[in-house]
Regions:
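Conserved PLP-enzyme active-site core in the AAT-like
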Residues: 2-10, 76-295, 308
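Short active-site oxyanion
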Residues: 68-70, 95-98, 414
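Conserved C-terminal alpha-helix-loop-beta "cap" of PLP-dependent enzymes
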Residues: 287-434
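Conserved N-terminal alpha-helix of the aminotransferase class I/II PLP-enzyme fold
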Residues: 34-79, 103
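N-terminal "arm"/small-domain region of PLP-dependent enzymes with the aminotransferase-like
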Residues: 1-52, 180
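Short, compositionally biased
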Residues: 116, 434-441
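Short glycine-rich or small-residue beta-strand-to-loop segments that form or flank ligand, phosphate
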Residues: 44, 71-73, 154-157, 337-341
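Structural signal for conserved beta-strand scaffold positions within catalytic alpha/beta enzyme cores
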Residues: 72, 121-123, 211, 330, ...
Length: 441
């Protein structure tokens, strides 16, 4: 597969041209990658008005992902999430309401405020972690049935930070029935397209989807995709670049663009086989950890989510692994998360298993968290643009939340802008070590 962006950048780096243009390093080595770090010079195309090498590269990515249109982001899925909400607003059914599973990335809350959306939250029936918000199609059906009109979109995060995956197919069917778009934050699941069978949200019926390529594919940090489904309206496909330009920098990283471009060749050249092999290794690792006394939680195939046993936190377990030369993705009171890809060697997994060792401690039942369904005092937008102050979390009871407070992104916010902070929120602040919160004055 051609790599037009990477090829252009390399040719320019070797050309000996006098760089009388940005950036200021002029290709001289400071970190070592500067020769390949260029700007929108003649022939380099322009990310938001792509007609040349970027357009060609994005079309190759669209073919690989089976989308109606795929566009690049150099600012992660954060930019794509904002763009998805903009598209739902401008190309949807005219509603200014969005229905969202509560475990959103905070950028969703900020985007909803900027676009003046009202948010109707979907809550889990029970939850043992703020990272997960399993929502059944029946729960969504009941929620949509109570609304006076269909929302602009239903928004889900899948996989979540612990690797939990939503039933996208069933949720998409409910969305079609009610005439609303389905947008999925698939930041942690770009690779899902290449499983057999594919379980990528586009394949399962999502209208809009964002993938953080950099999280699970060999792409530099910030590289991401916004995908539009083939069956989606033409207006969604045609407006994708406008939506991205609304929220993106006019100085996109060509290093990141080149890495997205090279990733197309990587995906086309035997990636499915390498992915299948790694998924098999990780399944064997799950069995080995279970046999060694560890409780391994269900998750997407490239993630190991291990519950901390009684007397130990996930953070302490992470320290134990770190001392053996293994750095994890995430740890909290209850869980440890490790993310691996085909770029990890078999020796990495052996080292990881050795670092875990054997667990002889018992596992206590996981308590159900007291989810804080705070009283809505004002809209998210009103709260975020109102004067605020920072107060100790322990003294915030009864105050109105100014900025969304989360233990980690993406996760169920303990309190969202415009909600009154109640006793349950205080308990969660204490549990997750939140010391300060922003509240309205």
């Amino acid at each position: 597969m051609e790599t037009p962006i990477a090829d252009f950048v390399r040719r320019y780096a070797d050309s000996g041209m006098v760089r009388a243009h940005m950036p200021g390093h002029k290709g001289k080595p400071f970190l070592g990658c500067e020769a390949l770090d260029i700007t929108e010079i003649q022939g380099a195309d322009s990310l938001y008005e792509a007609e040349g090498i970027i357009r060609r590269s994005e079309s190759y990515a669209g073919e690989l992902f089976g989308s109606g249109r795929t566009v690049y982001s150099t600012e992660g899925s954060s930019q794509c999430i904002r763009a998805m909400l903009y598209l739902a607003l401008t190309c949807g059914n005219g509603s200014r309401t969005v229905v969202a599973a509560r475990n959103v990335h905070r950028v969703f809350v900020y985007a909803a405020a900027l676009l003046d959306f009202e948010i109707v939250w979907l809550w889990p029936e029970r939850s043992s972690s703020l990272c997960g918000c399993p929502v059944s199609p029946d729960t969504l059906e009941r929620t949509l049935a109570t609304l006076p009109a269909p929302p602009a979109a239903v928004y889900l995060t899948s996989p979540d930070y612990l690797g939990g995956m939503a039933d996208i197919s069933a949720v998409a069917e409910v969305c079609r029935k009610h005439g609303t778009l389905l947008a999925v934050d698939n930041a942690h699941g770009a690779y899902l397209r290449f499983l057999e069978p594919s379980c990528h949200p586009l394949e399962l019926g999502a209208d809009l989807c964002c993938d953080s390529a950099h999280k699970t594919l060999p792409v530099l940090t910030g590289g991401a995709y916004l995908h539009i489904n083939r069956a989606a309206s033409a207006s969604l496909r045609e407006s994708a670049k406008t939506a991205m330009a609304m929220f993106g920098s006019t100085s996109p990283s060509y290093l990141t663009l080149a890495s997205l471009d090279l990733c197309n060749r990587y995906l086309a050249d035997g990636y499915r086989d390498r992915l299948r092999e790694m998924c098999g290794r990780l399944e064997e690792a799950r069995k080995a950890l279970t046999a060694a006394g560890w409780q391994v939680e269900p998750s997407d195939p490239l993630r190991l989510t291990v519950k901390a046993p009684a007397g130990m936190t996930g953070g302490q377990l992470a320290n134990r692994l770190r001392e053996s030369g293994v750095e994890c993705e995430y740890a909290d009171l209850d869980f440890l998360v490790l993310m691996l890809t085909p770029e990890n060697r078999a020796a990495d997994i052996e080292r990881l298993l050795h670092a875990f060792g054997t667990n002889d401690a018992v596992y206590a039942p996981q308590p159900t968290l007291p989810l804080a369904r705070g009283e809505r005092v004002c809209s998210v937008r009103e709260a975020l643009f109102a004067p605020r102050e920072t107060v100790p979390a322990a003294r915030s009871l009864g105050r109105v939340c100014g900025a969304p407070t989360v233990g980690c992104p993406p996760a169920i916010p303990i309190a969202v802008s415009g909600e009154r902070i109640g006793p349950e929120a205080l308990e969660l602040f204490r549990r997750y070590g939140v010391k300060q919160v922003e509240v309205l004055r």
